[in-house]
Structure formats: C-alpha cells, structure tokens
C-alpha cells in the first residue's frame, strides 16, 4: 500500500488525474472503475482539462461505475447516471456504449447485478479502480459487516450513509434506501486501486484503513489485502495518522 499526502484537495485531485492519464497512455483501451460523490469531482475536472489540451484520449476507454441508487431513473438529477454524464462523460470523447453504470430501475435487480459482473468480465476486468471512502469506511455502497467476497449486489443503506448523502436531496426522506453496488470481492479484482479522501471528516476512516486491523466493520480495511493500492489524501484526511507512521509515507507539498 502506497500513501501519498498532498497539501490540499486540489493537489490530491491533480495527482489522481495524473495517475489516470498515465494508465490510459500506457493502455488506450483501459477499463476504468469510477466513483461518484464530491471527492472525485476535482479529478474529473482535471481529466476534462487534460482532454481539452489534447493530452488524453478516451475514445477506447471503457468505464464501470461502482454503484447506483435503486429507484432513480438515469435522468434524475441525483442519480449517478446523471452525475457522471453531467460532470464528466459529456465533456470528453468517450463512446456511450463504453460507459457502464448499474441500472437502478431494472425490473429484475438480481439479474441486473449478475449482468453487470458479466460485463466487467467480458471487458477483461478493471485495470484501475478509483474509490472514495465514507465516514464509516464504506467503499462503493459496501456498508460495515458486508462480506469481503461479495460481487455486485443490492444493499440497504445505513442511516449514517443516508444522513451523509441527504445534502444532495431536499430532505433525508428523499434519499433512496437501497442501491446496487459492486461488491468488495468485485473491487478487489481490479488490477490497480486508487483511493481518494479529503477533509477531517474522513480522517478516522483513513487512519483505520491504513493502520487498523482487517475488519468488516470498516470495509476499506480489506484494501490491505490488495497487491497494488495507492491512497491519495490531503493533510486534513491524514491528520489522525500517527507521527511514527508518517515516516513511511510520501508527502507532496
């Protein structure tokens, strides 16, 4: 596990975008695993700028998003379909047929989960998976006490997650109670993983992820078992990492 600490959110975002750019340069038909939420927004902004400067070509890139709310149509402003197209896909030259996001309004949700796993396998697996982290250590919508071997599945969101996401809705009541998410087992199959975190509210989860015991109570601790993980965090998210551990960590200022 490699940990990079940056001075702020902007530098964290830039570093993440550089890693994605390098991956696509090395393999133009890269399969990217993507995340939503406020954390990766800056990375998407930098990737769009790189594309506009002619530094990066997404025409052969394939993407798979981690998750989607159940019950929200793709054109709903709070759906992750809408988020990804509005904030990223509409601004680059990716082919729509190469974009994959779980269908939260599928008639048969179990079949949708099975098909999603099948599509990932058909694409050759995920080359680079981008992750955020919840304040309770969840990755994707894999909540505490999930099995570390799960594939794409339907999950019931915890009150903590609902409260954390209510800022995107008019009220907590409007936040969907269920979602489709790639499982921890699916995520761990990625060839490389980059986890991003910013802000003091993520500091406890980051401390546990980097130095804590492997436990399903903090899903991100499973990343310690992966062979190629880079964690990029700003100083605030790194604020609870013990001083003695900072010696082993790359700090970018």
From Swiss-Prot:
GO-annotated cellular components: cytoplasm
Gene3D superfamilies: 3.40.50.1360
GO biological process: carbohydrate metabolic process; glucosamine catabolic process; N-acetylglucosamine catabolic process; N-acetylneuraminate catabolic process
Reactions catalysed according to its record: alpha-D-glucosamine 6-phosphate + H2O = beta-D-fructose 6-phosphate + NH4(+)
Molecular functions (GO terms): glucosamine-6-phosphate deaminase activity; identical protein binding
Domain of life: Bacteria
Active site: residue positions: 67 (proton acceptor), 136 (for ring-opening step), 138 (proton acceptor), 143 (for ring-opening step)
General function of this protein: Catalyzes the reversible isomerization-deamination of glucosamine 6-phosphate (GlcN6P) to form fructose 6-phosphate (Fru6P) and ammonium ion.
PROSITE patterns according to UniProt: GLC_GALNAC_ISOMERASE
Lineage per the UniProt record: Bacteria, Bacillati, Bacillota, Clostridia, Thermoanaerobacterales
Protein name in the entry: Glucosamine-6-phosphate deaminase
Pathway: Amino-sugar metabolism; N-acetylneuraminate degradation; D-fructose 6-phosphate from N-acetylneuraminate: step 5/5
EC assignment: 3.5.99.6
């Amino acid at each position: 596990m490699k940990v990079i600490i940056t001075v702020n959110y902007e530098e964290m975002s830039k570093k993440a975008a550089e890693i994605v750019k390098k991956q696509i340069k090395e393999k133009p038909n890269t399969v990217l695993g993507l995340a939503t939420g406020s954390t990766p927004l800056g990375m998407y902004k930098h990737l769009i700028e790189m594309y506009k400067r002619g530094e990066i070509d997404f025409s052969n890139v394939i993407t798979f998003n981690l998750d989607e709310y159940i019950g929200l149509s793709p054109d709903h402003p709070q759906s992750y379909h809408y988020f990804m197209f509005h904030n990223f896909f509409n601004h680059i030259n990716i082919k729509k047929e190469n974009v994959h996001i779980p269908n939260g309004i599928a008639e048969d949700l179990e079949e949708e989960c099975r098909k999603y796993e099948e599509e990932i396998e058909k694409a050759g697996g995920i080359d680079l998976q981008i992750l955020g982290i919840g304040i309770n250590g969840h990755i994707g919508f894999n909540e505490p006490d999930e099995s570390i071997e799960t594939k794409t599945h339907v999950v019931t969101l915890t009150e903590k997650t609902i409260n954390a996401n209510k800022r995107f809705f008019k009220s907590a009541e409007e936040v969907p109670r269920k979602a489709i998410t790639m499982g921890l087992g699916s995520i761990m199959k990625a060839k490389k993983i980059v986890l991003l975190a910013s802000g003091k509210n993520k500091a406890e989860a980051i401390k546990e992820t980097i130095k804590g015991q492997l436990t399903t109570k903090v899903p991100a601790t499973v990343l310690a078992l992966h062979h190629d993980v880079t964690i990029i965090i700003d100083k605030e998210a790194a604020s609870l990492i013990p001083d003695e551990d900072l010696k082993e960590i790359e700090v970018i200022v």
